[in-house]
């Protein structure tokens, strides 16, 4: 979340910057609440001082043998007023906190200004889409022809937006995840982690999915115990490793990677990508997270994005990189790059990774800090996250870009060691 001090001291400037994201900050309401808070706080502090003085005078009156009943009554009355004032302060602060938790991050000055995805800016492209000399099939047709992809059985088991992978495609899916993990740990310096797939609410508050995006989550309610949520991304569990910690500066940067399933309700996706594996309730993803010193986070974003790009380059999959505009960025991001891979059957690029610098936005929620060696004082870290990559969408891209006229699929060179040396499936 944003720094409340920044909000108080530069409210209109913050509102103007948020407007570029299409977010209307209720300046009048915040100003009114702040005025109430100051008034009640001043009154409460004065009342506390008066009560302390009156309490002291009770002892003095006792020593003089005076009737202390009126003083006792005053102290009791002031105590009741203090309790009332503190309760009022708590209510005001609760409303301010509620507003604060609903405010998105401020965009970095380098982020292009725009209302929606049309305002995104293409930064670069890599590779050239294959010019097929035969009628191409989409991944669904390729998979169902051989019985490798079974959406009918998946629907019988779980409903819409699930997939059952079998045989060579299941193996190819596993190979992709193993390849990605090995690349990031072996060449990019990430520490592999195996994390819980179920987390409690504070973890999701820390990474900003709660309270604003609860409808996108799958929730498990347990009688007498804390609710649990299925992770929408390993970003949640990986980033929260440092929640509540004060790290030594020598520990930074921390770089974590994990291969996990992800679970999303896709509440706002009705009618979109209903065919195939592009948009699922359950999908696998290899997630990268970095925890860094504030001065290095923008440079770290470039490195994180390059790590994700390397996966696509080694797989020889054409892609492009977009700098997301202010109106299309995620809630907690300062700056985001999207990687989009070429999907031949759709004749367009589709998102396969989103790499974001969240600045101190998540760290403030989590109270994740490091000790500044120059001042000796704790300061908030910066957090970054990115897909490296979404495994299911990468599988889609491999199937379609490596298809042959007879419906078989060539195995990318870097995956052959994970496929027992197979060169073609189908």
From Swiss-Prot:
GO terms for biological process: selenocysteine biosynthetic process; seryl-tRNA aminoacylation. It holds the Pfam family Seryl_tRNA_N. Pathway: Aminoacyl-tRNA biosynthesis; selenocysteinyl-tRNA(Sec) biosynthesis; L-seryl-tRNA(Sec) from L-serine and tRNA(Sec): step 1/1. CDD domains: SerRS_core (cd00770). ATP binds at residues 264-266, 351-354. It is found in: Cytoplasm. Keywords: Aminoacyl-tRNA synthetase, ATP-binding, Cytoplasm, Ligase, Nucleotide-binding, Protein biosynthesis. GO terms for cellular component: cytoplasm. PROSITE patterns: AA_TRNA_LIGASE_II. Belongs to the class-II aminoacyl-tRNA synthetase family. Type-1 seryl-tRNA synthetase subfamily. This is Serine--tRNA ligase. Consists of two distinct domains, a catalytic core and a N-terminal extension that is involved in tRNA binding. GO terms for molecular function: ATP binding; serine-tRNA ligase activity. Its EC number is 6.1.1.11. It is an enzyme of class 6 (ligase). Catalyzes the attachment of serine to tRNA(Ser). Is also able to aminoacylate tRNA(Sec) with serine, to form the misacylated tRNA L-seryl-tRNA(Sec), which will be further converted into selenocysteinyl-tRNA(Sec). Homodimer. The tRNA molecule binds across the dimer. Residues 41-60 have a biased composition (Polar residues). HAMAP family: Ser_tRNA_synth_type1. L-serine binds at residues 233-235, 287, 387.
